[in-house]
Amino acid sequence: SDISGRAGFGARLGAYLLDFVLYGFVLAIPVIAGALVILVPIASNCVSVPGSDEIVCPPGVPSGSSVAGGVALIVLGILGVIFIYVRAEGKTGQTWGRKIVGVKVVRVADGQPPGFWRAFGRELFGNVISGQILYLGYLWMIWDRDRQTWHDKVAGTIVVKV
C-alpha cells in the first residue's frame, strides 16, 4: 500500500517525547499539590529523634483527611491528563506533541479522527501491551508495510503527516 503520507518513526518518536514532556508538566501540578497536602503537615508538626532515623509525629499527623485529599488530587490529576490527552487524540487526531511535529492519528477506514473511545482503546493497548516486550509493539511500525504499530492495528488507525 502507499505509505507516502504516513508518518515515519522519527516523527512519531518526536511527538511521543514532546507529549511526555508537555503533558508531564501539566501532570506535575496536581502531583506536587497532592504531595504538599500530605507532606506539609508532617514537615510542620513532626520532629526527628536526635541520634536516630526515627521521626515522631503527634497523634493524627498526618491526618487521614490530608492523606486522602493528597491522594485524591494526584489520582484526579492523572485521570484529568489522560482525559485531556485522549479527548484531543479522539477529536482531532492530534495531541500537543503531534500538533508540533505535524502528524495526526486517523481511522484507516475513512481518514477521520478516531473518536474518543477508539483513541482510548488505542492508548490503553499501546501503553499496556505495545511497550511490554522490548517496545516491540511500538517498533513494529519500522517493519510494517503500512507503518502501523500494534495499537494502530488493533484500533484500525494510522498516523499521517499533516
Residue spans for each PLM region:
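Helix-coil boundary and N-terminal low-complexity module in membrane systems
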Residues: 1-24, 46-57
